[in-house]
Amino acid sequence: MSTPTLTLSEDRLLPRESSALAAAREIYRSTKGLPIISPHGHVPVSWIADDMAFSDPTSLLITPDHYVNRLLHANGVDLEDLGVGRKTMSEEDNRRAFRILCEHWRDFAGTAMRYWLVDQLIGIFGITERPSPENADRIYDTIAERIAQPDFLPRALMDSFDIAFIATTDDPCDDLDGHARLAADETFTRRVAPTFRPDKYLEPAAGGWTGLLARLSEVSGCDATTLDGFTEAMEDRRAYFRQHGAVSSDHSHRDLGTIILDHDRAASIFDASVAGRATVEEMALLRRHLFTDQARMASEDGLTMTVHPAVHRNHDTAAFHRFGADIGSDVPVTLEVVDSLHPLLDKFGNTDLKLVVFTIDETLYSREIAPLSGWYRSLYIGVPWWFIDAPESVMRFKHAVTEMAGFSRVSGMIDDTRAFCSIPARHDMSRRLDAAHLAELVVLGRLDLDEAVEIAHRLVVEQPTQVFGL
């Protein structure tokens, strides 16, 4: 019996009706070859700075991809068997992990993960066999042979993927050595920027907060154990990040609550939090005040402020204690935006601030986020991420926001991934869905084809360039 083949239709995700398909093909062709701009993601800078060969298919395609890991876990796989939380994996361990993926291939049917994996297997590695227990080792060997070649080093992939700009995610106290080395290397022509991620420094109720303040004090040279010193330290580190090419900060709190406390009240709560005397309610107020002050800083220093709220992080407590964060056990929660952001937008909504609001609560797009972005100059709509970046939910997003906010108020494509080889697949999917949506408008007589082509280009290039100040 012959092995079933993997297929990758040239017209995947494009509309089936003939006139819409013709328009979508032309629109997609106009953006297919454009460089990738990736303003928010989680690829380690060390991969690119050190330019070391990827050691094996598992550590490249499986272990860092929490999209893949979470579904395998749901179907009975121990994350440790996928390399999660392990410092070393033997060759047999890596093969076993890859066999597990192939054994569970059917569990990915209909998911975005399968779509991206197929694109990677065919488009990057030339694999045309559908993964199965029988061919797992053969596919593993093909990928292993491919990644051992010089043209598969990370910097070479940056060129072959045509990634013009990519952002990493970094702690405010990071020295950004990898970014500095890349910037100083005249042979490296791509752009890799850090992203300022201060979440845990703004959460006085979180464990270890005072230890973080001590570290921040050490790195910045400011006494971060007082409100004024903390503010100075944050401004110092933001400036350091900008000097190393940063264009944005990223924030992920449970809610979007904002407030501007008077200085004495904020300082008093800050002091009480450092001393361990603040109430839960006071610490929540302080966190919202500190978060709002990041918007004030952004309006002054030019870093675009992105927010990824409404996630119950580390929902599986036992898995968190065993493996740590960012393993895929997060769960969406509901969110309220209009009232929560009102203090911030009332102060900074029509200033030079650029605020990109993401959500994984789809109900918010047409009810709250799109109407806000249709008024406030500072607010942009973040494209779907995490649980809602599959083709179906992306199209729902486009229909929900375009009718009231148009195309000029969206962030442009954000892949938000740790899976390096999935970046081309994710951006290609986005361009195909742009083409499908725009073709609908052309067929309905709401756009001319030349306008649709221009908008598609804008969504890929001009929009992220403008929103992130590239």
Curated annotation (Swiss-Prot):
Catalytic activity: D-glucuronate = D-fructuronate; aldehydo-D-galacturonate = keto-D-tagaturonate
Keywords: Isomerase
GO BP terms in the entry: D-galacturonate catabolic process; D-glucuronate catabolic process
Keyword Isomerase: yes
Top EC class for this record: isomerase
Pathway: Carbohydrate metabolism; pentose and glucuronate interconversion
The keyword Isomerase is annotated on this UniProt entry: yes
A Pfam family this chain is assigned to: UxaC
Database matches in SUPFAM superfamilies: Metallo-dependent hydrolases
EC annotation from Swiss-Prot or TrEMBL: 5.3.1.12
Protein family according to the UniProt entry: Belongs to the metallo-dependent hydrolases superfamily. Uronate isomerase family.
HAMAP family according to UniProt: UxaC
Protein name (database record): Uronate isomerase
